[in-house]
Amino acid sequence: MAANTSWAALGKATDLRNRIFFTLGLLIVYRLGTFIPVPGIDGASLREFMEGAATGIGGILSMFTGGALGRMGIFALGIMPYISASIIVQLLTSMVPKLEQLKKEGEQGRKKINQYTRYGTVFLATLQAYGLAASLEAGDLVTDPGLFFRASCVITLVGGTMFLMWLGEQTTARGIGNGISLIIFVGIVAEIPAAMAQFFSQGRSGAISPAVIIGVIVMVIVTIAFVVFMERALRKIHIQYPRRQAGMKVYEGGSSSLPVKVNPAGVIPAIFASSLLLLPATISTFSGSDTGPVMSTIMAYFGPGQPLYLLFFVVMIVFFSYFYTFNVSFKPDEVAENLKNQNGFVPGIRPGKKTAEYLEYVVSRILALGSAYLAAVCLLPEILRAELAVPFYFGGTSVLIVVSVTMDTIQQVQSHLLAHQYEGLIEKSQLCGKSKKRTTRKAPARR
């Protein structure tokens, strides 16, 4: 597609240009909001605490909130409650018959499910905000602890999360790219310069050897190249169309291919898995020594870098890869039905149910490779990060999110440019047709 798309046409594509400016405007609003603090926070104590937690769980949480958690901004919870609510609603949609029926009702059913997701977001954000407010008080990071602080903190953080959810939905509908993914993407990219400065300052002070610095740089470059290769990898399923007759016209049969990505779920499984595993860490981060025996035990076994954490990370990535693919991004039954309606078929496979079973079999095998790729990209740098204490922004999850979102956004821009070029060609052909008719009418009659 890139070869057929002229980037010079960007200036003429008014709708695309407006979408890009709209997206940039909303993302700027998001970044400004990360610097607005929650009322009642002791800024000096918070900065001192976050300096000690920057390379640990604090750095991980800051990655998903664009640094807002480290500054205790109004967007400190980030978009994670919305993602968690989406996971729960999608799981329930597959298990509850009423929700499954809503899913099949088209646009109206989708709106109803989105409404349930918003209710779930408010509920989860309220729980997390209250837990975070209590943890801040326990960690002596509040100037005036008490009921008023907890209430104001909960209202502020829940309002910030709902505003981010609205920003993401508006970006998806009226801008470019997936709004939720772009919010996480911008948060990661905005914090990378500070992480790099911290990383190289550790090298200058001798805390990290030059060999480790070179190794991390090489690892990041190799990871980026590997992610780009795997995200562009496709399995093409051959589709045949028979010869058919409509009235007096005979249409010749043809063939095409159905492209299936090696990683159809994209970056969603990594985001889902990370958001769920970080729920207990969000509460325990600011609690100091008052964590409690239960939470201390959980963090001892399920903290980042621990064997059980890594094991559950892999299991969740594999699970969400299959779950998201077959429930959202690629539904074999719907694809088989569409092929049947278009008189298309897979050679050697009967249309309908047999085609759906074949597609499910093929995609399941592809997903085995795709989920293994996701787990490797997210897991191996995580192990190295735990051993070498490098900033989390150089980890596999952050690299995967940045590369995947960049590629998806560029692809959407190219699609809009290509559509604009086709619209221009159609308008030119229509104008040429009208001018020829006018010339024919004005031609003088022969005597």
Model-derived features with residue positions:
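N-terminal cationic and glycine-rich segments that engage phosphates or anionic surfaces
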Residues: 1-103, 107-447
